[in-house]
Amino acid sequence: MSFQDWMQAVRQRTELALDRYLPPASHNPQRLHAAMRYACLNGGKRLRPVLVHAAGAVAGANAEALDRCAAAIEMVHVYSLVHDDLPCMDDDTLRRGQPTCHVQFDEATALLVGDALQTQAFATLVEAPLASTTIVELVRTLARASGAAGMAGGQAIDLAAVGQALNEVQLEQMHVMKTGALIQIGRAHV
């Protein structure tokens, strides 16, 4: 199998995992669940899940554990995109060629989608068939990577810099925190 074919297989596997671990749109609250599914199952490069599966392949990791880790990291990534698109942040109206979550639904629903995806990510991760010590380490690492020391902190730097020029060090710090933290966990903690 070529690398491109393998990446496509991982993307498809991730799509199926997200579909499996997200609440069904038919369950209450239906609008929230439909919006979560809209945000997560609307395409994307799935770079972080590819890195999870690559690291897992090298380590000989359990397939279900990889699926859960990949889905959890992707849920956190998607929640960050949903929040990033909000009018109070970047005010984007398109994501992956489709209306953003707050445009397709509404701002309040989009905010709740981000919140729900973050907690769903941790709920998905803790059910992985792994040793409890490994799960605790994964949860700790994902929390740090997505919090003030990682993705959220990078977004705060980005927002504070609106209308200002960042120097090279500040720009690198913002990108390492905002983007690099989840990529790092994706390849390092399987």
Where do the protein language model's features map onto the residues?
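Non-catalytic interface/linker regions that flank or bridge core catalytic/transmembrane domains
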Residues: 1-3
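Mg2+-dependent prenyl diphosphate-binding active-site environment of isoprenoid biosynthetic enzymes
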Residues: 6, 12, 22-189
